[in-house]
Amino acid sequence: MGKTAKHSDEVTDEMWNEVNPFNRDMVQEFLENQTHLSKKSLVQYESGLRIYFYWVKENLNNKQCVEIKKKEYLKYQNYLTRRGLSESAIKFKKSCVSAFNNYIMFMYEDEYPTFRNYVTSEMKVVSTGYVHEKQPLTPNEYIKLCKALEDKEDYQKLAYVMFSYSTGCRRAEARQLLKEVIVD
């Protein structure tokens, strides 16, 4: 098993308010126009972009997003690697910034004709060897959770917990379960 990865620090609303207003407004507009993303994906994109632009505030003098260059973005990516984030976390943050840049290129072509997406496929994410350690429920935690759900009469969640715990299936696999296959 690899080394345990660190989690990104959350950017609070207070910290976010210190970020260049132009960048904050552009992020907000970008998120509002991502109608193809689920609510959970939007939350992740918002978090990834907040982390990035707070880093820009701290390390690039709060530069506007349309002025950032490739070498400056690479410093951010190296910062994430040095912090001990997992490879998948770094790739996701890279994807957020790239999607944001593509949005600017498409929507603001007239206003910023020389702007290009500075996040490119040539920028490889270093394999860090860091992973997030999975912490399965202990038998006592499982019993306590089942008891709490039963006390709340939340039988659907109780059935899900019992099924997934006893079979070891993943969330996506559990969704595929059909009532027709359950035998009395």
Language-model features and meaning:
Residues 176-184:
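Conserved tyrosine-mediated DNA breakage-rejoining catalytic core shared by Y-recombinases
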Residues 21, 67, 136, 150-153:
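Short helix-capping and inter-helix turn/linker motifs at the boundaries of alpha-helical repeat units
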Residues 139-171:
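Basic, Lys/Arg- and aromatic-enriched nucleic-acid-binding interface segment
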Residues 42, 87, 157, 171-172:
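Internal amphipathic alpha-helical segments of the cytochrome P450 catalytic fold
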Residues 25-132, 147:
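N-terminal core-binding DNA-recognition domain of tyrosine recombinases/integrases
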Residues 45, 97, 160, 168, ...:
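Alpha-helix N-cap/helix-start motif at helix boundaries, enriched for small hydrophobics
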Residues 1-37:
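N-terminal DNA-binding module of tyrosine recombinases/phage integrases
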